[in-house]
A protein has these predicted regions:
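Regulatory N- and C-terminal appendages and interdomain linkers associated
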Residues: 1-12, 33-36, 40-43, 47-51, ...
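Phosphate-binding glycine-rich loops and adjacent basic patches that engage nucleotide phosphates
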Residues: 1-12, 51-61, 100, 104-120, ...
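ATP-binding pocket architecture of kinase catalytic cores
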Residues: 17-107
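Active-site acidic catalytic loop and adjacent metal/ATP-binding pocket
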Residues: 17-24, 28-30, 58, 159-203
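Hydrophobic, well-ordered secondary-structure segments
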Residues: 85-92, 155-158, 176
Length: 204
């Protein structure tokens, strides 16, 4: 807390939308899963303006860093995740209009290597979902599940679903890959967004 200029106090735990973060006054402290992604998100959110959305802004440490010893700090945005599906989609459209001009981060082009992290698992799953041959998308060194009926059924379903996909004509751009986990609602206030989980995919 002191690294981000916060005085000692009794922080309050928050939910999954804040990655299990802790609120101290108007600041939320959260542990990060990936330093590079956390710093990128903070840098983007620091200056990004999206009409009709409340973005959590990064709070830099006393020496100017976005991440300190695996922690980041952001301004608190009130609200809770709610099943307002149309509003989440609308928020995504507005956000992606604003992120359309952002360059592709280098880390989104890198292939995961052992030892794998949770972020790597999602990265590989994303690439498999878009690959022409999803089951061939796993890089060398990927952990394998033991043979089981569930695994065989999963492979069968993936193969079926892959055959139902249709090509998209929309260009790839910087998109938020976890809107339902990061969009907050409170009354009639504009939707809030706690973080940006970056992917390079078509926005529609």
């Amino acid at each position: 807390m002191a690294a981000f200029g916060q005085k000692s106090g009794e922080p309050q735990p928050l939910g999954g939308a804040w990655e299990g973060g802790w609120r101290s006054g108007e600041i939320v402290l959260s542990m990060i899963a990936d330093h590079t992604r956390a710093a990128w998100s903070a840098k983007v959110r620091e200056t990004l303006f999206v009409d009709g959305l409340r973005l959590a802004r990064p709070v830099r440490s006393t020496d100017g860093r976005y991440v300190v010893s695996g922690w980041r700090a952001d301004t608190f945005v009130s609200g809770e995740p709610e099943p307002r599906h149309d509003e989440v989609v609308s928020a995504g459209v507005r956000l992606h209009e604003a992120t359309a001009t952002l360059e592709r981060p280098r880390f989104l082009t890198q292939t995961p290597v052992p030892p794998w992290t949770d972020v790597d698992v999602f990265t590989v799953a994303d690439r498999a979902a878009w690959d022409d041959r999803p089951l061939q998308a796993l890089p060398l060194g990927a952990p394998e599940l033991p043979q089981s009926e569930d695994r065989e059924r999963s492979v069968e379903l993936v193969t079926q679903l892959a055959g139902l996909r249709k090509p998209t004509k929309s260009p790839s751009q910087l998109v938020h890959g976890d809107l339902y986990g990061a969009v907050l609602f409170t009354g009639t206030a504009a939707p809030g967004i706690t973080d940006i989980t970056p992917y390079w995919r078509p926005a529609s």
